[in-house]
Amino acid sequence: MRTHSNDQDWVVSWHHSTEKPTGRAHGAAGVCLTHPGELVLISHDGDHWGLPACRPEGNEQPEETLVREMLEEACALVTGYRLLGSSRSLCIEGHERGLVLVRSYWRAEVMVQPYAPRFEVRHRRPIPAAQALNVVRDPDRAGTRVALRALREAGIC
């Protein structure tokens, strides 16, 4: 699927967990589920709700990025995880033309901690997992489609 972000055009694709797409590691995203079956979402603006995700620090492995970022962005302690797949974004027009970014998506069992917003994330919202299709919305249409695919792979919808 095509998208436009930061004055650049991208082609975004989904890859199953058995595939290893090539490109620069661009972080990890978590479909975070609590024991009572709630899905933990975050928002920067209070209007668009999505999966916690961010870039790796140093030489982190994707699993390490997942665990760190879920705690930092959603104040959620990861107790278990399973790789769902990856998104691969190829810049086809713009100053980063040719750049390929790969982000891993994980199903993560979490224990929600008291919320203390830090960094750019201002809102956290646990919702019944069954409501995910009605709530998950990224400002970017391709981002929403990838998040919904991750939810399907996680068995949410």
Predicted features and spans:
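Acidic, metal-coordinating catalytic segment for phosphate/diphosphate chemistry
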Residues: 1-29
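Short connector loops at helix/strand junctions that flank enzyme active sites
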Residues: 25-27, 44-46, 51, 78, ...
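Active-site beta-strand termini and strand-to-loop segments that position acidic
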Residues: 32-35, 108-110
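Conserved Nudix-box catalytic region and its N-terminal flanking loop in Nudix hydrolases
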Residues: 33-73
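Unchanged
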Residues: 56-142
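Charged phosphate-binding loop/patch that engages nucleotide di/tri-phosphates or the phosphate backbone
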Residues: 134-157
